[in-house]
């Protein structure tokens, strides 16, 4: 029984991933989430930028929590990974943390709440090669469509 459920969830997740591929991100990363907002009859996309403080759940029930400071007040929002209101996620910067849940940030203010940026130890040539390979893969994908 659970095998069938797991298989159906995997199929649905693959179908959603086809339309909208989310980047790999983890707690500590600063992300910009493109959220679809409906006001009356109009629908628009709004950016919500903050630090990912947690990822929870698995399969279609996977969520991530993003925390930002708005007008001096901490605001947290939980987004389902496979929700249709999430148009896309962009990783702004990678954070260096040693925990999976960063709830301790709730009690910190100002500079104490900052997260160190993860350094990329690859050489410039390696980064350029990776970028070129990604561009070629994207071009091949576009040509196939």
Swiss-Prot record:
One of its GO terms (cellular component) is cytosolic large ribosomal subunit. GO terms for biological process: translation. The keyword Ribosomal protein applies. Keywords: Ribonucleoprotein, Ribosomal protein. Gene3D superfamilies: 2.30.30.790. GO terms for molecular function: structural constituent of ribosome. Signal peptide: none annotated. Belongs to the bacterial ribosomal protein bL19 family. NCBIfam families: rplS_bact. HAMAP family: Ribosomal_bL19. This is Large ribosomal subunit protein bL19. The gene is rplS.
